[in-house]
Amino acid sequence: PRMARYAKTKRFSAKLGASWARTLQLVTLGAAIGIGAASQGCRTSNDDIDRWTTTAQGPRKLVAVLTHDKYPLEIRVEAAMGMVRMKARGGRRIGINGQDDQPGLLSALESIPPAVREKIVSRMVPRLEAEMKKEPPKAQAGQAAPADPSFDHKDAAYALLTHNEGTLVQGEEIKQRLRVALIDWSMTNFADRLEESSQLYGVEQVLRFLGADGVARLPPQLVPGAKKLDRMADLI
């Protein structure tokens, strides 16, 4: 009887362990891809990334793609850029900063091993640079000008440089490229960009972080009739 009870207990424990393993596997798969099958990961496309920037569960799916090593590097970079482009929800830029129960780009990058993170960030930088160089969209006749997407990319560049004392960006060359991109962006349409209320990090905050290099090109803009002369003078 004792051996029978032992065998029965062993079978029960094995069954319980298998059940728990299956549950854990399902939870892991759900977190990793936000859908019901692991095989979907290899089929994730840029179109999926674009769509997820606008859906309710999209932020979780983008984080899952960015952080999981089963996805190709380029689609992980695309997920990161999708989080940069994601519009504010409820007045919060959850793509970059996340929210209480949902990590954003910065927290997701922190969770990735440094060697892999460096590869992802180094591929993000040229795309951030390109978007920050684009001209603001023009207003159509009788309509307000569309939102300038370069603000989102500027915010991401600044966040990468400064989050957790700058540890997300490891290479000095990449750091310098981001700094130059931020200076160029800030010196373009300076007065207008100074007043944009939707940006996460104001132009003045960015320039103060960049120091003397950031404001070196402001003095030539101090001409009679220029907008925001007092603000420029304060920065210099």
Predicted regions mapped to residue ranges:
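Sec-dependent bacterial lipoprotein signal peptides
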Residues: 2-42
